[in-house]
A protein has these predicted regions:
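P-loop NTPase motor domains
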Residues: 1-291, 306, 374-395, 410-471
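Conserved nucleotide-binding/hydrolysis micro-motifs of P-loop NTPases
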Residues: 22-25, 228-230, 299-302, 327-331, ...
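Conserved ATP-driven motor cores of ASCE-family P-loop NTPases powering translocation/secretion/packaging/pilus
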Residues: 283-385
């Protein structure tokens, strides 16, 4: 981002950043804003079921899959506790999405609801009262049903307290002010992904005419930055990718089955990300929607560690594999087997020194690995081996980036071209396309919307009580 942001901006791209390393330089990302509205069988907004309920379940599944720390894991091995917690969180999310306006549909509200779970002297909590009132108005709501299931499952007070405590621990990071400020609202505009790049595109105009929410053009670049030394907040990146894949599928349908603008997703240091549910299936499916996904790994063991039972399926979904060097024996053995063998002609000669000396020359046909493990491990820097499905392997030099026609637009510290250094924090403060500004509160930066002034004509009656002062 720092190096190529200037070039992207110059070409008219909108740059959005989810920065989990330096949160003051991040756009805002609220996952609840991407829970889709529900429509009935004839295509109209469904008042009785206003949201797509499976989106809520998908979001909670992603959160739970990526927040498995020692302090909240179930050590008994009994799935009951995790299932009960999941039902409890589902009820809270459904309540938030049903009863709060957009400005308050966030994790802060969910945590506030959890704080209402403490029962009074009668054994009834304020949260119970909220759901009882909802149940009278909408007894068939899935949120009401899930809360009733939770109350039945956690009938004992101690059991209920344990489930609530575990749920609180799982969402504890949203109590951190930096994270709350970053996730309370949303400026990511993920719905733009894959849309036509021209605002005047007939297809984009048609889509917006049929949509309740206007969608911007697809000329946008997203950067997801994680902290290399700490994976505490990486679950947000996993949620981001999970929702991004779902939105790509929806946008492809809006565009007639395939995205109007090709999307390239580069997942460098992929092993640092949390678990993305159904990643193998998404990898196989999305490539048919005008989407390319590049996964960067240090070794094969990183892939096996993350997807123990399906790592081979991940590789099967990749049409090309680029090896740029490494020392991992497991990785090298896999690549040697992938390269296969080649037929070699072996020439051998012999000669005897005796009274009746003789000599002989023999040609043999033998099989040999195209490259041995030792040869691959000693491959010179700057070289690579490229595997392409259905074609074979190529041994080549890496492309020299300096030969690219746009290289001069990149920031390069050695070239002393600091004017091409992209600073997203400045864009958040002063960018021409931004309608929000960065403020500082005790050293903490956060993003808030700017209210645009209303301009209108006035008459004499409006000026009766107006007092003018001057110096």
């Amino acid at each position: 981002m720092r190096d190529c942001g200037y070039s992207l901006k110059k070409k008219g791209y909108t740059i959005k950043v989810l920065n989990l390393d330096d949160k003051s330089c991040s756009d805002c990302y609220n996952p609840l804003m991407y829970i889709k509205e529900s429509h009935n069988n004839i295509g109209y907004y469904d008042e009785e079921h206003p949201i797509q309920e499976d989106d809520v379940m998908s979001l909670i599944n992603t959160i739970m899959a990526n927040t498995k720390s020692e302090n909240i894991q179930n050590t008994s091995g009994d799935p009951f506790w995790e299932k009960a917690e999941m039902i409890y969180l589902q009820a809270l999310f459904y309540y938030t999405l049903r009863h709060y306006d957009k400005a308050h549909q966030n994790f802060t509200t969910v945590l506030n609801l959890i704080r209402l779970s403490n029962p009074d002297s009668t054994g009834v909590s304020n949260l119970d009262r909220l759901f009882d009132a909802w149940g009278k108005d909408e007894p068939e709501s899935i949120g009401v049903k899930q809360y009733k299931h939770f109350k039945v499952a956690a009938s004992a007070p101690k059991m209920m307290s344990t489930i609530i405590m575990v749920a609180t621990a799982r969402l504890a990071s949203f109590n951190i002010k930096e994270i709350a400020n970053m996730t309370d609202t949303d400026t990511m505009e993920l719905n733009r992904i894959g849309m036509p790049m021209d605002n005047n595109s007939p297809l984009l105009k048609q889509i917006n005419s049929e949509s309740n929410k206007p969608i911007g053009n697809g000329k946008v670049a997203y950067f997801v930055i994680t902290k290399p030394s700490n994976n505490t907040f990486n679950y947000l990146a996993s949620i981001f990718y999970t929702q991004l894949f779902e939105i790509i599928d929806e946008n492809a349908k809006l565009c007639g089955g395939s995205l109007a603008t090709p999307v390239e997703i580069y997942m460098d240091e992929w092993a640092q990300l949390g678990e993305i549910p159904r990643f193998v299936e998404e990898l196989a499916y999305l490539r048919g929607l005008n989407v390319g996904i590049t996964v960067g790994l240090q070794s094969l063991s990183q892939l096996k560690q993350k997807y123990k039972d399906s790592w081979e399926s991940v590789l099967d979904c990749c049409d090309s594999t680029l090896f740029m060097g490494g020392m991992s024996k497991e990785t090298l053995e896999y690549l040697v087997a992938l390269l296969g063998k080649k037929t070699w002609y072996k020439k051998s000669s012999g000669r005897t020194y005796a009274r009746q000396g003789s000599s002989s020359t023999n040609w043999d046909v033998v099989g040999r690995e195209l490259a041995t493990l030792d040869e691959l491990s000693k491959m010179p820097s700057g070289n690579c081996v490229l595997f392409i499905a259905g074609i074979g392997a190529f041994y080549s030099k890496l492309y020299n980036l300096k030969e690219h026609p746009n290289y001069s637009e990149l920031y390069e510290p050695r070239d002393n071209n600091s004017q091409k250094l992209y600073n997203h924090k400045k864009e958040l403060q002063y960018g021409e396309n931004a309608d929000y500004r960065m403020l500082c509160d005790s050293g903490l930066s956060f993003v808030i919307p700017i209210e645009k002034p209303e301009i209108r004509e006035v008459d004499k009656d409006d000026l009766k009580d107006l007092k003018l002062t001057g110096v």
